[in-house]
Every structure is written in C-alpha cells, then in structure tokens.
C-alpha cells in the first residue's frame, strides 16, 4: 500500500527536464511493520502474540494469561470477604460491579487460555507449519528472523477460515485412516505371519493405509529378487574382480556386449547418504539440496520476444504523405532566386 503524490502543475520544477526525474513517492503502510501472528486464545495481546512455531513463547504467554485469570478469581474472593472500606469503595453497587467484572474477566481469560492450550496440544497445526517453513526460508536467504515474532516480513498468515478448513480436512483423513486400519489389521497380520516378507520402511508403512501400497511394494520386491537372481546366474555369472581389467579392456575396445556411452554426463544432483524414511528427514533433504534449483541452474534457456504484427499502417501513411507533396513551388522558388542574382 502506498501514496502517490502527483507532480506540480508546471510539469518541470525549476526548469529541470522531466525525463530524468521520478515524482512518485511510495510511503510504506505502517501496519506492515506490526507483527500479525495468528492465535485462537491470545488475541487480547494483539501484536505481542509470538510466532506459531515458537512453542516456548506461546506456552509462556498462555500461562501468564491463566495466571492473570486466577488472580482475578482471587480478587473476587477477597471482595466477598472484605468490606472494602479501606479501598474507598463503600458503595454496595460499586462493590458488586467490581466483583462481577473480575469474575467475568477471569473466566474469559481462563477460557481463552484453554482454547489456546488445546490448539498447542494438537498434533497438526497449519499455522505452525506455515511459520516454520517461512522461518527456514528466511534463514536460507541470509536473514535473521525474530525469535519471538518469526519471519513476519516474508508472508501473511492464513486466516481463521482457511486454518479451520485444513484442520477439518485433517480430522476427516485421520478418521478414515483409523477406520481403514481397524478393518485391515487382521488381514495384514495374517499375511505377514504366513509369508516371510521383507519388512517395510517407516515411510512406506505410513503410506500403506488400505493395503494397496504394500501390495505394490511386495510385488516390486519379489520381481527384483527374481531379476537379480537371473542376472547372477546368467549374464553376471563370470563377473568377478579377477577378470575386471580384461572386461574393461573389452568394453573400451567395443568388443563387449556392454556398450560405453561417451556422451553420458553424470547428473550434478547428489543427495549424499541422507535417509528419507520420515517426513522430517525428507523435508530436511529437500530444503538443503533443492533439486529444482539445481535443475534451474543447469538449464540454459533463451527468451525471444517476437511481435505478433507489423506496424504497417504508419509506414503507409508516411509514404502516401511524401508522395502527395508537390515539387513545383520549390523549383519556381529556386528560379526566382537565380534571376535575382543575375
């Protein structure tokens, strides 16, 4: 958001040419400097709400709000037992209004704190994932985001409606997953007990919800076992370290069944020895290596702007105007000048 200040009525100020100056002044919105971290039960704190991925700060602020609510309840008990004469509140109406105000305020603070604690106890929080992602992005770009407020300048947090939609979708998925696990737990256990199958990785076991992915994995595993047994028994039967030099010579001379591809270039993308069995490990590998950035750096591309039409109308107008200019007055003028000199 900005404010546009138009130039003066004279166009050029102090005789300066307007071609080199820029009269546009952009004033940033002051609200953009105020952190706007989302929350369910800490809205009373306004811009002091910490980032959604800063769990220690959220727990501290929630505990502080609960403490203020409990102090309000203690104030209500104190007002009930004392006559409040020493505080200058001798009127019964003032005493009752103060008591009810403390009771309502304390109840509201404790209730809001309970809502916030329930959000922090949830295993999935879209606000947490969003704040954590942009904090990592800011650190990767060389910035130092605030420990309390997070990377507020990199994104605008999602609103409550979008957050609620994602939470509702996640709950429905979890319900479907639990129902599917209860239905297939007996069949899966019987299959594993009868067949001595290869154990699944944690990532694959998390994907095998209704048995589809586990069946695909088992079929691929069995086909791979058959393939490498066939290779070891047939084409790779005589392959060992003793005849390695001889085999390499035959490959380089082109006399082997294995052909050497001289145009092959080894890809630059290397993931190292990192495991990606869990979502956290996969996210760490993806953020550190960024395969799409590697591919973008190794891809050469040219951009050419080709016009879709030719501006022939102006050229035709100029040509017709030059043809229609008469040349006789010019020749007469030259003759008159020559006669005057004579």
From Swiss-Prot:
Location within or outside the cell: Mitochondrion inner membrane
Pfam hit, one: Mgr1
Ranges of biased composition (kind: Gly residues): 8-21
CC per GO annotation: mitochondrial inner membrane
Q: Organism's domain of life?
A: Eukaryota
Query: Which residue stretches does the UniProt record annotate as biased composition, category Low complexity?
Result: 319-331
Q: Which InterPro entries match?
A: i-AAA_Mgr1 (IPR013911)
Topology relative to the lipid bilayer, per the entry, is: Multi-pass membrane protein
Q: Which residues lie on this side of the membrane: Mitochondrial intermembrane?
A: 1-56, 118-342
Signal peptide range equals none
Q: Which UniProt keywords apply?
A: Membrane, Mitochondrion, Mitochondrion inner membrane, Transmembrane, Transmembrane helix
The main location is mitochondrion
- Can you tell me where the transmembrane regions are? 57-73, 100-117
Q: Provide Mitochondrial matrix-side residue ranges.
A: 74-99
Region listing for Disordered, in residue ranges: 1-28, 317-342
Its subunit composition reads: Component of the mitochondrial inner membrane i-AAA protease complex.
Q: Which family does it belong to?
A: Belongs to the MGR1 family.
* Cited function: Component of the mitochondrial inner membrane i-AAA protease complex required for mitochondrial inner membrane protein turnover.
Q: What is this protein called?
A: Mitochondrial inner membrane i-AAA protease complex subunit MGR1
Q: Which organism is it from?
A: Debaryomyces hansenii (strain ATCC 36239 / CBS 767 / BCRC 21394 / JCM 1990 / NBRC 0083 / IGC 2968) (Yeast)
Q: Which gene specifies this protein's sequence?
A: MGR1
């Amino acid at each position: 958001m900005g404010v546009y200040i138009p130039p003066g009525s004279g166009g050029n100020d102090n005789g300066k040419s307007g071609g080199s100056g820029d009269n546009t002044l952009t004033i940033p919105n002051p609200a953009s400097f105020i952190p706007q971290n989302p929350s369910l039960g800490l809205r009373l704190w306004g811009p002091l709400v910490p980032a959604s991925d800063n769990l220690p700060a959220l727990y501290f602020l929630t505990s502080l709000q609960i403490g203020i609510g409990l102090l309000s309840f203690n104030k209500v008990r104190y007002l009930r037992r004392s006559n409040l004469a020493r505080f200058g509140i001798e009127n019964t109406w003032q005493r009752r209004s103060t008591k009810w105000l403390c009771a309502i305020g304390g109840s509201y603070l404790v209730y809001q704190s309970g809502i916030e604690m329930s959000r922090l106890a949830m295993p999935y929080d879209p606000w947490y994932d969003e704040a954590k992602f942009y904090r990592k992005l800011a650190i990767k770009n060389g910035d130092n985001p605030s420990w309390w407020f997070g990377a507020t300048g990199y994104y605008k947090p999602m609103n409550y409606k979008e957050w609620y939609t994602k939470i509702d979708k996640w709950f429905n998925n979890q319900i479907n997953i639990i129902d599917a696990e209860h239905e297939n737990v007996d069949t899966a256990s019987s299959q594993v007990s009868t067949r001595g199958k290869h154990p699944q990785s944690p990532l694959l076991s998390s994907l095998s919800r209704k048995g589809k992915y586990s069946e695909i994995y088992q079929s691929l595993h069995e086909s791979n076992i058959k393939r490498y047994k066939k290779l070891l028994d047939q084409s790779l039967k005589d392959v060992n370290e003793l005849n390695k030099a001889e085999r390499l010579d035959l490959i380089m001379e082109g006399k082997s069944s294995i052909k050497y591809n001289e145009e092959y270039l080894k890809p630059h993308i290397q993931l190292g020895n990192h495991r990606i069995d869990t979502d956290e490990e996969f996210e760490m590998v993806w953020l550190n290596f960024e395969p799409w950035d590697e591919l973008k750096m190794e891809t050469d591309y040219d951009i050419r702007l080709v016009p879709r039409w030719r501006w022939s109308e102006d050229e035709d107008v100029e040509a017709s105007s030059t043809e229609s200019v008469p040349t006789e007055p010019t020749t007469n003028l030259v003759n008159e000048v020559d006669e005057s000199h004579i």
